[in-house]
């Protein structure tokens, strides 16, 4: 130090995170994120001690990860027509070599890369080239709009287990993360009607001892599908499965990680996690859906009527949810912000939607509740945003 004003006092710091994982999920399916732009997202995350990036690689609109056993997935199902006003490509996929490079690069920043393969719903891209994955075996086109498709994988069809087994074999070799996300969301009624009318699914119900043909019992078929995938991931690849929590799917295997995402239903998800000795990732929409606008009318050209999640809404997230010390020690896994890409159409928009809400999420996941205050956060955030501006990082000023 040149003088006393430049000196740093001798001190000792003791610090540790409140939650094990502080994650951002990105969705290159609806709008493809070119590899170099995806890679550039990681250093900014690491600045704020966000330590996991969750890649939503499969959905109705595209299949984005190379699977060498099934080359048609990327040759044919990585292109989507429609939504022509998007400024980013709607064609593209990531090679396994790129993903290995991403894993290595992220590790330098202490960020792990977690892949997600959706099932049994949100699989139209795969079904478009392999219709034998369904109950009906009829080819359907890739979905070109938002929303939820009624198309599902057929749990009574042994081919889907062969298919998924081969997919996970390659993923396990590419991604060293101990976690793989299996999706599981929005495979509800009336989509489950296809299982009711499927001879293979009805034969499986009989084999499982399910005597009723009631549609509500079809959830047990999803449970069977997940049980087989959990066994595969745990026993063969030593991976911990993750899921999007759904109230109708009440069976959660101990040790799995379930994501509480539906707005207003977090308490039910927490209760299910505790009862099943599972762990939970908090990403409730009212706090953590970063694809939602931060202010009413923000970017109306791409906002299809989503609710508003303000910066303060994100900061209000209490990862402990008032559940007590036992819950935090035994069940709380982490917090996650989600960047679904129906309305994210440029690289700048990714940052705009993520920041500064990701700063609030990072603090919620790191600091104990007693050490947090909205006023203090704002004071610390403003010079951080000035630094981001100097470095050319886009962020929202709607706070």
Region annotations inferred by a language model:
Residues 241-247, 251-399:
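Flexible, acidic glycine-rich loops studded with aromatic residues
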Residues 116-118, 186, 363:
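Acidic-residue sensor for enzyme active/binding pockets
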Residues 1-179, 195, 228, 232, ...:
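Feature activates predominantly on carbohydrate-active enzymes
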Residues 47, 108, 235-236, 275, ...:
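Residues at alpha-helix termini
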Residues 32-36, 93, 97, 158, ...:
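Soluble non-cytosolic domains of exported or imported proteins
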Residues 32-34, 60-66, 120-126, 181, ...:
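Flexible loop/turn segments at secondary-structure boundaries
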Residues 50, 111, 238-239, 278:
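Short glycine/serine/threonine/alanine-rich loop segments
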Residues 126-132, 136, 141-257, 262-277:
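Active-site neighborhood of glycoside hydrolase catalytic domains
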């Amino acid at each position: 130090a040149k003088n006393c004003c430049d000196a740093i006092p001798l001190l000792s710091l003791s610090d540790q995170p409140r939650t094990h994982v502080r994650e951002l999920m990105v969705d290159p399916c609806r709008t493809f994120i070119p590899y170099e732009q995806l890679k550039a997202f990681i250093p900014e995350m690491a600045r704020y001690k966000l330590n996991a990036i969750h890649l939503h690689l499969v959905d109705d609109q595209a299949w984005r990860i190379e699977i060498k056993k099934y080359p048609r997935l990327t040759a044919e199902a990585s292109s989507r027509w429609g939504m022509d006003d998007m400024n980013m490509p709607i064609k593209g996929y990531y090679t396994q070599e790129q993903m290995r490079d991403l894993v290595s690069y992220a590790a330098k920043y202490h960020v792990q890369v977690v892949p997600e393969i959706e099932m049994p719903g949100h699989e139209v891209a795969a079904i478009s080239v392999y219709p034998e994955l369904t109950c009906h075996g009829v080819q359907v086109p890739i979905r070109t709009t938002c929303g939820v498709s009624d198309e599902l994988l057929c749990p009574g069809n042994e081919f889907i287990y062969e298919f998924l087994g081969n997919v996970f074999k390659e993923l396990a070799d590419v991604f060293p993360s101990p976690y793989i996300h299996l999706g599981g969301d929005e495979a509800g009624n009336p989509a489950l009607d296809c299982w009711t009318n499927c001879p293979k699914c009805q034969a499986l119900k009989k084999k499982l001892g399910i005597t009723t043909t009631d549609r509500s019992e079809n959830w047990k078929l999803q449970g069977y599908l997940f049980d087989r995938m959990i066994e595969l991931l745990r026993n063969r690849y030593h991976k911990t499965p993750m899921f999007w929590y759904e109230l109708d799917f009440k069976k959660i295997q101990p040790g799995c990680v379930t994501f509480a995402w539906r707005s207003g239903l977090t308490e039910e998800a927490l209760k299910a996690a505790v009862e099943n000795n599972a762990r939970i990732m908090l990403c409730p929409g009212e706090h953590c859906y970063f694809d939602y606008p931060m202010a009413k009318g923000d970017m109306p050209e791409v906002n299809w009527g989503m609710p508003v999640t303000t910066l303060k809404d994100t900061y209000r997230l209490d990862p402990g949810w008032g559940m007590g010390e036992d819950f935090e020690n035994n069940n709380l896994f982490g917090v996650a912000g989600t960047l679904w890409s129906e309305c994210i159409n440029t690289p700048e928009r990714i940052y705009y939607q993520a920041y500064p809400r990701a700063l609030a999420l990072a603090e919620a996941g790191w600091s104990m509740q007693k050490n947090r205050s909205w006023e203090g956060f704002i004071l610390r955030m403003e010079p951080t945003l000035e630094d981001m501006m100097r470095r050319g990082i886009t962020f929202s000023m709607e706070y």
